[in-house]
Structure formats: structure tokens, C-alpha cells
Amino acid sequence: MDLAIVSSPTRDVVRCCDCGCDCSLNGASPGSLLRSVKRKYEEFENEKLFHIPELELDLSSNAKVQIENELELLRETVSSQQQSIQDLYEELDEERNAASTAASEAMSMILRLQRDKAELQMELRQFKRFAEEKMEHDQQELLDLEDLIYKREQTIQALTFEAQAYKHRMMSFGFTEAEVETEKNMLSRNPSMIENDYQYDLPTSDYPPIKCNVNENPGPLEADIDVDDVEKYPLADSPHPLKTLERRISQMERNPSFTQPTGDVSGGRHYTEKNVVGQSPRHQRHFRRVSTGSASSLLGTTREKRLDFSNDSPRSNNGSFRKMEDPPYAAGNSFARDKGDSSEIGDNDMNDRVYTIDSVHHSVSHSGTAEQKFKNDTADGYAMSPREISNQPDLGDPEISKLYMRLQALEADRESMRQAIMSMRTEKAQMVLLKEIAQHLSKDVVPERRLPLRKTSIIGAFNFISVFKWITSFVFWRRKARRSKYMNGVQGNNMGLQMLLEKTPRIRQWRCLSSTQV
């Protein structure tokens, strides 16, 4: 509002206050001042252009208010307005800070939830992968178990067929079914016999033994089982009683006079055997192990008499047994007791191998050639017992005789080849030994001392004495050349006469002189 009043320049201006406004109190009449206030009041009432909420002026009191009070009131109003504005700004800042804090907290919560969600998803994937792998592993184990169960069932079936084959084979040797079952029960009740089977190992030869059939042909049951089942499933999975049974049968097939010791090992041994004429229908496997010291035997209990079958076939018509005494066999047993277990094992193995060779000589012909062959084999270290010779099969068929003659030739070739290989190995060993001795001798010999070469000078090589000798020898040679050529009366030690009489060329060493010029 404009309250300033222009006064004359001759008057001094008297200011109403110290605020720096242009209003002045000097020269202003009260009438003009009231008119200006009325005009402002009318404008305020009519147009409402200037409205102050805190200022509630009473119309009756307007005339009484002085101008100083109005200015102070306006100043207070402005200051209060500024203070309220400042308070509003402070509240706005507080609200803004609270909103930003809430937003940051909400954002951190969102981030934390996202992180937890990612961790849960990762754990879920890990557990899912672990569960899948575990399911695959369990499924693979189930498949492996099913395969093992199938193989075990096949092995059990093969062993069942094998046991039936052994049972029929033992029955073909004359045993009854009751004896087979009794022996099976005895083997199952005595595990110590199974452990003793592995105490002795015989040295294997360079060549495996030849398998052949003597008097019988393999039956269809044995052929089918051996080819289809037994060889398909090895005996590593078979129980110990069946392996022991197979070992006993194999030993009985290889050596018909095989005896099984019974009773105490340290005390006197009593032997019993069932002598079977001929070989088994089929050599399925060749074992180099025998068992000793067993309380139970595959071939029966303790007896001092042995049973012999008839000489025709294991399955004879009468089926009767002949009991007979065997004094030579008892003497052989006493000799075996003196030598010990190791000699028994070695003799059984060697007798088995020679039995295959010498049975041909005894059965085909009883001439002196067979006796000479038997003596040669015995001299080489392979002996046969008299019982083995007496129990050889009677080969009357010419085809079988030819086959066994060929077998004899093959065995002879085999032995000769074995001897040749052994001699070659011996010669090779001797050659290696000689080479080693030569190497040691060459190392032990002291090397010859080499004398240093002396460089001869020209003056020393062609001295006066050597020249004089050369001239003298030349003169005497010319004088000898002018002698008479008639040699009558010449002494007997003349060199020329000896050359004529001996008619042998004589070569005289000529001394070659190098040139004196350098």
C-alpha cells in the first residue's frame, strides 16, 4: 500500500519509523490520512483483494488503531507466516525421509526375498539332481542284482546237472546210489578233508596229459552236460564237496590202483581201493592235487582187502565182486610209508602218465619190444606198479589197437620233443654261463703295457757301424757267388745241399734298406 505523501521541498521530512519506508508524518493532515485509510478499507470490503486471516479488525476499532500498531501487526503476521512455512518444510522433509527409509527397507526386503528364492531354487535343483542320480544308481544296482541272481540260478542248475553226471559216472563204476549218497553226506560233514586237499601241489610237466577213452564211449548225458553246462560255468563257484568229489573221481580215473589213506596220519595207514578195469568214459579235467590225512574216503571205509571188478566192463552182467588178498600191494604200502607223503604224490602222478603209454605195450603185444619199451621208460624215471600192469584192458579190436599204436608213437614223439627242449634249455643255460665267464675273464685280464715309441733320428739310424756291416755282407756275398758249383766233398751241414735234398722252398729274409735321402 502506498502511504507516502509528497510534501513541499522546503520542509524537512519526518519519518514515521526506522524501517526504511517513504512515509512521513510531517505536513500530513489528519483528514488526508483518514481518507486514504477509508479508501483502503472500502477496497478491502468490496473487492476482498487483501485478506489476512489472523487479522480480524473490528469496524468500530479501525479508527482507533494507530498506524504504528498496524505495521507491527503486519510484521508479526509475516513472521508467523514464515514460521509456519518453515514448519511445513520441516514436516515435508521428515515425511520425505520416512518415505525414503520405507522405500529402502522395502527394497532390501525385496532383495532378501529374491535371494532366498534363488537359494531355494538352487537347493531344489540339487535335491532333484541327487534324487535322479540316486534313482539311476538304485536301478542299476537292481539290474546288477537281477543279473547276479540269474547267473547264480544258472550256476546252481549247472552244478545240479554236474552232480547228476558225477552220480551216473560213479554208478557206472559199480557204486550204488546209497553209497553215493552216503559219501556225499560224509563229505558235507567233514570240512577238514576239503582243507587238506590243498596242502600238496604236484609239479606240472611241460606238456598236459593226453586224454583218451579206453573201452567206453561217453553217454549223451555226460556229453551234453560237459559241453553245454559244465564248461560254460566254471567250478570256481561250485561248493567244496563237489570239487572234492570231482578230484577223487579224476584221481580214480587216472590211476585205477589209487588208494585213499584213512585213519590217523601219524600212525599206521590202512588202504582200501576199488580197482576199476580201464579208464573213465571221459577225462573232464586233470588235477595235480591229491589229499592225504582225511578221516573219510571217497572209495570206502578202512579195510585191508580190496574189491576188483570183472575184466570185461565196469557194467558187467553178474555185477559181483571178487575179494582177494594182495601181498605185493601191502609191501608197496610199507614202502610208501617209509618214503613219506611227498614220494607217494610224485609216484602217483608219474605212474599216471606212464600208465597211458605202457598200457598199449602190455595189451597189444606181449613181445620183447614191449618189455624193452617198459624197461626204457622205467630207466627214465617213470615206474609202474605190478597191479597197474595186471589191470590193463584187453584190446581185441584192431581199430583200437591201431589207435593205441598211434597214441604210442605220439607219446614217444612227445617225450623225445620234451627231452630235446630240455637239452636246448640246458645248452642255452651253458652258453649264457660261458658268456658270463668270458666277460668276467675279459674284465680280470690286465691290459698290456704299451711302450712309448721312440723317435729315432736320422743320424742314429744310419750310423757308421750299420753302413760297415752292410758293405761287409755285400762283399762276402759276392765272394760266395764265385765259388765252384760242384758240391763234392762239401760238409753235410751245407745249406744248398739241404735245399736240394729236401726239395722244399727256402725263403731268406732280405733286409730292406730305406733311402738315406730325406
Swiss-Prot record:
The lineage of its organism: Eukaryota, Viridiplantae, Streptophyta, Embryophyta, Tracheophyta. Residues 310-320 have a biased composition (Polar residues). The gene is MYOB7. GO terms for molecular function: myosin binding; myosin XI tail binding. The modification Phosphoserine is found at S385. Keywords: Coiled coil, Membrane, Phosphoprotein, Transmembrane, Transmembrane helix. The GTD-binding domain is sufficient for myosin binding. This is Myosin-binding protein 7. It is a single-pass membrane protein. Interacts with myosin XI-I.
